[in-house]
Every structure is written in C-alpha cells, then in structure tokens.
C-alpha cells in the first residue's frame, strides 16, 4: 500500500518539475558542513516558510553513503505516549516514491515498544512527509536503492525518551543508516499560546532568537537531561522536542562520539508587537568524530 503525499499542493508544490527546481535552487545556496554528517535536525513547515532552511540540513545527506534513512517526527494530530511505525510499503512524493524498509520496521515492532499506525494517521501527519521531497531530490539517482524508516514520536516521558534512544542506538551506529530529526523551534504568539518575553531590552524577535539559540546550544552539548530542564524552565514550544531528546539519548548510547553543530537559523517573520506571531527554524547536524 502507498502513503499518498497528502500535503502536496498546499504545504509544498505538487508539480514535479517546479518542485525539483525549487529544491535545487535552495540546495545550491547551501554549503555542506562535513562529509561525515550522520544525522540532521530539519524543519517541517510549509516550504514557503522553511524550505530554504531545510536545504542547509539536506545538503549534508550524501545518499551514496547510506542504504536507509530513519525519519523521527512528532505527532501533531494524534495523542500518543509511544512511537508509531508505518505498515505501508511506499511513501509517495511528487518527484519519486520512497520504499519503506519493512524488515527494519518489523524488527522495531518486535521490541514491544512500538505501535502500528493506521494509514489515515500516517497521511494526516506532516512532520514526516515534509522531509520526503528533500530526501527524494538529494537521492534522485539512488531512489531504488534507498529505503526509509519513518517513526512517529508521541509525547514521551523522559524514561521513554531514554528507552527509545537505547533501542535505536545500534541502528545509528550502523554505517548504512542516516537519521533525520524533524522539528521546528519556537512557535511564538497568542495563536500558539506562547508569548514569553522576559528581556524587554531587545525586540521580541531578538528575544525569541536568544531563547532558541540557548536551546540549540544545549542540543550541541549532547545532554538530554539538560535539554529536558531547558524545556521545563522555558516552556519553549519546540514541537519536535521528543524526537530531539530521543536523538540525544541515541548519541549517549552510541559507541561513537559525535560533534553537534548549529548550521542555520531563521524565523518565519519578525515579531515586533504582542499581536504578531512567528515560527523559528533551526538546523543542526551530528557529525561522527574521526
């Protein structure tokens, strides 16, 4: 069965030629950080908002180096306290379909810590789908060889974040696997229920950036406990906080060491007054140390 690209034509272009050109243009503006990037944190808003930022993540995916891409994204539409896997064989994009690695999803399910998503749950969620066109574009010459492992991450306790980190760490250590963590950063404004503004000496948009960059610095430290404390203290509305935390626990349980770096940051708009709103997009990479 196929997961249809339900957000094409609204969140991003559904015309293959135009979409490919758009992605190519954005990728040409970005610069690769390192040949050894093993994981990225990339945004998942509509491409008119975050498409350019995502290029700074995906320029670091070298498809020739990998056989499968794990994608961890938050669940926006269904409340779940666990992680969900897809039963579908293929996920569609306008520029080429991506096959699911069923052997891997079955092995993950057999751990007893995952559930199966329904087709409608898969198709309603945008955080995973918004990563697919970029993967398909970057891997356009290897679409038949590359597979994906989409994982929908629910609202996890710290203990479960750690558990999933331990489960997934051996997969991260496998040199054939690349990990994508899907997350936007601060959602600021009354419509998001978040209007924290403590440093009145700077404009609101600058305060938001300070807040986000503090979070990104903690992610760079690789400490999931400190990241949890930061979220508890600031209540920053990072929608992919659980996938990010799982990724930090993965690196904690990895047999290798990783350098975590911030690559790019922007906001959908500059908040000047309290009635304004914005969403932030931060891009980070996890690079294996030699």
UniProtKB/Swiss-Prot annotation:
Q: Kindly indicate whether the keyword Coiled coil belongs to this entry.
A: yes
* Keywords carried by this UniProt record: Coiled coil
Residues annotated as coiled-coil are: 12-39
Keyword Calcium (UniProt): no
The family note in this entry says:
Belongs to the MEMO1 family.
List, alphabetically, the HAMAP family matched: MEMO1
State what protein this is by name. Protein MEMO1 homolog
UniProt organism field:
Dictyostelium discoideum (Social amoeba)
Gene this protein is translated from: memo1
């Amino acid at each position: 069965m196929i997961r249809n690209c339900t957000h094409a034509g609204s969140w991003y272009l559904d015309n293959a030629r135009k979409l490919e050109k758009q992605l190519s243009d954005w990728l040409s503006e970005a610069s690769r950080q390192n040949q050894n990037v093993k994981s990225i944190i990339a945004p998942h808003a509509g491409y008119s908002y975050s498409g350019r930022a995502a290029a700074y993540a995906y320029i670091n995916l070298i498809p020739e180096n990998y056989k499968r891409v794990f994608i961890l994204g938050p669940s926006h539409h269904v409340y779940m306290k666990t992680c969900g896997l897809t039963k579908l064989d293929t996920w569609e994009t306008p520029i080429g379909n991506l096959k699911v690695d069923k052997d891997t999803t079955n092995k993950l399910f057999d751990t007893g810590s995952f559930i199966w998503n329904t087709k409608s749950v898969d198709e309603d969620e945008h955080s995973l789908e918004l990563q697919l066109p970029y993967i398909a574009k970057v891997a356009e010459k290897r679409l038949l060889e590359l597979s994906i492992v989409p994982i929908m991450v629910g609202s996890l306790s710290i203990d479960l974040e750690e558990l999933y980190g331990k489960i997934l760490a051996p997969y991260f250590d496998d040199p054939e696997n690349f990990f994508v963590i899907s997350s936007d950063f601060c959602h600021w404004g009354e419509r998001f229920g978040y209007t924290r503004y403590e440093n009145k000496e700077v404009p609101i948009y600058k305060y938001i950036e300070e807040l986000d960059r503090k979070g990104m610095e903690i992610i760079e430290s690789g400490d999931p406990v400190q990241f949890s404390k930061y979220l508890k203290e600031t209540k920053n509305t990072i929608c992919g906080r659980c996938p990010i935390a799982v990724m930090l626990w993965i690196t904690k349980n990895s047999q290798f060491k990783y350098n975590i770096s911030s690559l790019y940051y922007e906001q959908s708009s500059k908040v000047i007054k309290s009635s304004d709103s914005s969403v932030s997009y931060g891009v980070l990479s996890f690079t294996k140390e030699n």
